[in-house]
Regions:
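A bilobed periplasmic-binding-protein/Venus flytrap-type ligand-binding module shared by bacterial periplasmic
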Residues: 126-133, 266-284, 301-305
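N-terminal segment of the mature folded domain
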Residues: 37-157, 161-164
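Ligand-binding pocket segment of bilobal, Venus flytrap-like solute-binding proteins
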Residues: 186-258
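Von Willebrand factor
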Residues: 356-421, 427-473, 501-511, 532-533
Length: 541
């Protein structure tokens, strides 16, 4: 038998590879797009939903149903007030919106943008108090009114944490509900009612009970579970989930308070975004998904997650494992809802909260001016701080400081460099001037300025009168100073002040996470834009 000589194809493979490489280079130089995606999906075939973070647990059911009807469903989650901003800026990317409360659809600049809105389930926003604390206050198995909560706060017997009034749905609707009830539960809240001095004093007293504020509802849950707090305001379904976790760990659950004179109820509407009214197939897909969300199977699924679907929240046959009576949840009682005011009144009420009602804050910004910040980094820092501190700029996004707020600036490199302070939170011209003349140089030490910030807050701030926050921005690894010095100071002084951090450049996130874990805080990503990061962290104080 004669063996045939095997051909060597290696040279041919090399030649073909070279030709393909040459082809790609030439086409790229011509500016053509070579996106050969084997999993390519026509954008027109995708059904995009912009949805509240409160619905994220239901994503897979919606996506699976989309597959059943031949629709590729993509869901993006944001905070409710952020959804309003996104849709006002550009709604063309989305086909439907699932938001926590219909009032935010009314806040859209284009009142004709959404159609076919229907409530899917309802979700009250209430206060949960450790049951032993609620018993001591006389709230267990009793009719509780909003004035009872107010009196407990005034007497120093009740403190709580909540999410931002100006950046989250739970914060905003809880505020509007309490505002409405303290105004005497009128048929409709008016602008004139917002001018009542007694009402303003009651609201200031209510917010004096705030210990911490979160910029989003999800982090509020983490803050509570990781901290030493005994009350919080949140969604009913979230408080149920928290109680399930607490009891599974052998810890004391929260007792939910439903004031008989009114609670904030969210109707969670699912609505069509009519960007292209001629696309009948798209609208048909929307109607199918909406009908599925309102189907018995999905309603049962959502009830098991702690959402209600019954008129007035009443259902004597509700799942008692989820809607546990021992946690203060009584589904045989009608929930007294409020009628939300007009768009104009809501806007005025939010501005009133910022300027006059919320508990003042003292924020210490620790700003890295080490040598690595030279150039673009320092320029971005100056722009971001000017935006946050300038009243006119910040007020466009409801981020402005009020007259009663305090602001301190600690600049640092390998040591604390300078300290600047404001007497009034809305008079920041001198601080902005000093920031814009900062020079970069030296090494990086994030620990000494953090201790300095805590010292400033301890020496100048009363916990009962102010919320306290440290915001640290750095672009590098701390090569001097010691984390253990911060840890020692924090524990010796029984600190509870959050130390938030913003990453930039080549900052060492592990060092920043240590500070966040120590103080029950979090780290924000400023690498894609310092201005956006400072805006986000601002909503946490």
């Amino acid at each position: 038998m004669v063996k045939r000589k095997r051909k060597n194809n290696f040279g041919i493979v090399i030649f073909i590879g070279f030709v393909i490489y040459f082809f790609v280079i030439v086409i790229s130089e011509m500016g053509l797009d070579l996106d050969f995606d084997l999993n390519y999906t026509n954008e027109d075939e995708i059904f995009r939903i912009i949805s509240s973070t409160s619905t994220s647990k239901l994503d897979q059911e919606i996506i699976d149903y989309g597959e059943e009807i031949g629709v590729d469903v993509v869901i993006e989650h944001y905070g409710d007030l952020e959804i309003v901003d996104i849709l006002n800026e550009d709604s063309s990317k989305y086909d439907a919106v699932w938001i926590s409360n219909s009032i935010w659809l009314y806040m859209l600049e284009n009142s004709y943008l959404v159609t076919d809105s229907k409530s899917i389930v309802i979700n009250p926003v209430v206060m949960g108090i450790e049951k032993s604390k609620a018993e001591a206050l006389g709230f267990v198995n009793k009719d509780v009114y909003n004035k009872d909560l107010l009196n407990a706060i005034k007497e120093g017997k009740l403190k709580y944490i909540m999410s931002s009034v100006t950046k989250t749905n739970t914060g905003a609707t809880a505020y509007l509900s309490f505002l409405n009830n303290m105004a005497g539960s009128p048929e409709v809240l008016t602008e004139e009612m917002l001018k009542d001095e007694k009402l303003a004093e009651d609201l200031k007293a209510f917010f004096k009970g705030v210990q911490r504020v979160s910029g989003d509802e999800e982090y509020l849950t983490d803050m509570f579970l990781n901290g030493d707090y005994n009350a919080m305001i949140n969604y009913e379904n979230t408080l149920i989930e928290i109680n399930q976790k607490l009891t599974s760990e052998g810890k004391e659950p929260l007792y939910l308070i439903y004031p008989v004179d009114g609670v904030a109820i969210n109707d969670m509407p699912f609505a069509y975004i009519s960007n292209n009214s001629s696309n009948t197939e798209n609208r048909e897909n929307f109607l199918k998904i909406q009908a599925y969300l309102r189907s018995e199977a999905m309603i049962n699924k959502m009830q098991n997650e702690g959402f209600r679907s019954w008129y007035g929240g009443v259902n004597p046959n509700a799942n008692q494992t989820t809607f546990n009576k021992d946690w203060g949840i009584d589904t045989t009682k009608y929930l007294n809802d409020m009628k939300y005011p007009s768009k104009t009144v809501i806007t005025k009420a939010l501005n009133l909260y910022i300027e006059a009602l919320r508990k003042p804050t003292h924020v210490v910004f620790c700003l890295d001016v080490s040598g690595s910040m030279s150039g673009t980094g320092l320029d971005e820092l100056k722009e971001a701080m000017t935006y946050i501190l300038d009243y006119e700029q910040a007020s466009k996004d409801n981020l402005q400081f009020s007259e009663k707020d305090k602001i301190s600036i600690v600049t640092f490199n390998d040591e604390v460099a300078r300290v600047y302070e404001t007497k009034y939170g809305n008079q920041t011209q001198d601080v902005i001037y000093n920031i814009n003349y900062l020079m970069a140089g030296g090494g990086t030490n994030i620990y000494d300025p953090t201790i300095e910030a805590l010292r400033i807050l301890n020496s100048e701030t009363d916990d009962e009168e102010y919320t306290k926050t440290v915001i640290l921005m750095t672009d590098g690894e701390s090569n001097t100073g010691s984390y253990y010095d911060v840890q020692k100071y924090y524990h010796m002084n029984e600190e509870t002040t959050p130390i938030y951090s913003i990453t930039f450049g080549y900052s060492d996130e592990s060092q920043l996470r240590q500070l966040a874990e120590l103080s029950n805080a979090k780290v924000f990503d400023g690498k894609s834009g310092l201005k956006e990061a400072f805006a986000e962290v601002r909503s946490y104080n």
